[in-house]
Structure formats: structure tokens, C-alpha cells
Design a protein with these regions (language model features):
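Helix-to-loop junction immediately C-terminal to a conserved catalytic motif
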Residues: 52
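H-loop/switch region of ABC-family ATPase nucleotide-binding domains
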Residues: 204-205
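Conserved ABC ATPase signature
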Residues: 144-148, 152
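Conserved ABC transporter NBD signature motif
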Residues: 60-74
Length: 274
């Protein structure tokens, strides 16, 4: 079976010697639904950016579809055949939709990817209209993307990625800033995409989202290392792990003679321990 991603002892340091990833290793197989979990600053977004081939390891090795992803073999050769192959198979939905939107209309935004695949204009039109209908934004096709609401922008970004029909979807904090209805829509969409065999990797600290869209959790600590790589249910039920990685927190309350811990958890009601 093909290996989607193989990350081997990867570290990444930003300019100024700011360490973001520290000796990271894991593999991703086809059809997996994975959440990269961690508090703000743990490196999960950096890791997702690396998986999309936008940055390269400072140390270690990163392979996608059995090809090394590095500046020498991936970025330096602009007409690299594998580069085009990679971009066809991997789609990235950024946390900030405005970073991703650059076309003058929603239609053109969604059409941009298919146009790079040398499809005919008629084929592009068919593909775009199919995706717009699937996402439920056909009525927005002539709108300027930056006039849309946050939820509408997110839908356009997802439509633009899905227009290429990628095998792998990378999503950075996909539910951040969305209203409850749009969050539910997105979760249900990711569930359906998982059922048809898409490989879905999400970076998030929203534990409720993790529980609903992933089967595997990679938890990153504040030292930018992987703390745990395992089953989602097991991870979410590990209170000490969630506390130590700053994914939940607790404080003490006093009510008369009663003292109890107040545990704040993103994916469930507050838990009182007497």
C-alpha cells in the first residue's frame, strides 16, 4: 500500500532560531482521518504547512508518495513533474480564508485549480458548477469573495480545494470563527469525505471537532514534540495528557464548605470533581 506521508525525525526552525518542530516522526496511510492536536504555539500549524510542501525540514526527512520533499528536489525545479502531481493530490485549507482568496469572483476562485490541470474550458465549467452545487454556494458564483461572510469564505476555500478532487485534505483550524450552523455543515462534509476514502488531516485544539471527524490523534506538546500518537477516544479520555499539553485546564472553586476542581474541556460540559 502506498504511503501518503512519511515524516522522519523532522525539526523545523524559523528565521531567528525560533524552534517550531522538534524531532517529529510519523506516517500517514491512505484513507486515514487524523487530527493534529496541541495548544497555541505547539507547532501543529507549522507541521501542516510542512505536509503541504510550503516549507521544508531544517533537520530530518519528509517523503510524500515515496518522493522526498525538500528545497533541492521540490522547489528548485519549477517545472518538476512531481511538483504538479503533488499539488493535484494534496489540498490545503488555510485557517485564514482571506489568505487563500485572490480571484475577482467566486467562480474564478473555484476554477483556478482545474485550469492548472489543463482541462478544457467546458470541463472546467462542469467541474466548478458541480462543486459549487455540492457545497451549496451556487448563488455566490458571481460575488467578490472578500464581500462574503466568514462562513461563506470558508465554503469558497473548501470548494476551491475540492475542485481539484485531491486525495488528501489538510485543514488548519477549520471550525475557527464559524457560526454553529456552518461548523455542523463542515463537520458533516468532512465525515462524508472520509467515508469515500479521502485522507483528512486537521490541525486543531477544538476537541469536539476531533471527536467527530478523526479516528487518530497526534498530540503535540509545548516543547514542539509529539507526545502521543494514538486512538482519538483513548486520547480524549486521558485527562492527565490533556492537562499536561494545555488542551484543557482546571481551577479550584470554594462553595461554602465544599471545595471542588472545575475542569474546562472544549468538547463537553464543565466537569465538577468533588
Amino acid at each position: 500500500m502506498e504511503t501518503i506521508f512519511d515524516v522522519k525525525n523532522v525539526s523545523y526552525t524559523y528565521v531567528g532560531k525560533i524552534n517550531a518542530l522538534n524531532d517529529i516522526s510519523f506516517k500517514v496511510m491512505p484513507g486515514e482521518q487524523i487530527s493534529i492536536m496541541g495548544s497555541n504555539g505547539s507547532g501543529k500549524s507549522t507541521l501542516l504547512t510542512l505536509l503541504d510542501g510550503l516549507i521544508y525540514p531544517t533537520l530530518g526527512e519528509f517523503y510524500a508518495f515515496d518522493n522526498e520533499i525538500s528545497e533541492d528536489v521540490f522547489d528548485a525545479i519549477k517545472d518538476n513533474e512531481f511538483r504538479s502531481y503533488f499539488r493535484k493530490r494534496v489540498g490545503f485549507v488555510f485557517q485564514n480564508s482571506d489568505v487563500q482568496l485572490f480571484s475577482s469572483t467566486v467562480y474564478e476562485e473555484v476554477a483556478f485549480g482545474p485550469l492548472q490541470l489543463n482541462m478544457t474550458l467546458e470541463e472546467v465549467k462542469t467541474r466548478v458548477m458541480e462543486v459549487l452545487e455540492m457545497i451549496g454556494i451556487t448563488k455566490l458564483k458571481d460575488r467578490y469573495p472578500h464581500t462574503l461572510s466568514g462562513g461563506e469564505k470558508k465554503k469558497v476555500c473548501i470548494a476551491a480545494v475540492l475542485a481539484n478532487n485531491p486525495d488528501v485534505l489538510l485543514l488548519d483550524e477549520p471550525t475557527a470563527g464559524l457560526d454553529p450552523r456552518t461548523q455542523l455543515w463542515l463537520i458533516e462534509l468532512l465525515q462524508e469525505l472520509g467515508k469515500v476514502g479521502k485522507t483528512i488531516i486537521t490541525a486543531t485544539h477544538d476537541l469536539e471537532t476531533v471527536e467527530q471527524i478523526s479516528k487518530r490523534a497526534i498530540v503535540m506538546g509545548e516543547d514542539h514534540r509529539i507526545v502521543v500518537d494514538g486512538n482519538v477516544e483513548t486520547v480524549l479520555n486521558n485527562r492527565e495528557l490533556l492537562l499536561s499539553t494545555n488542551l484543557i485546564h482546571e481551577h479550584m472553586h470554594v462553595h461554602g464548605k465544599l471545595v471542588h476542581d472545575h475542569l474546562h474541556v472544549h468538547y463537553r460540559e464543565h466537569i465538577h470533581e468533588h
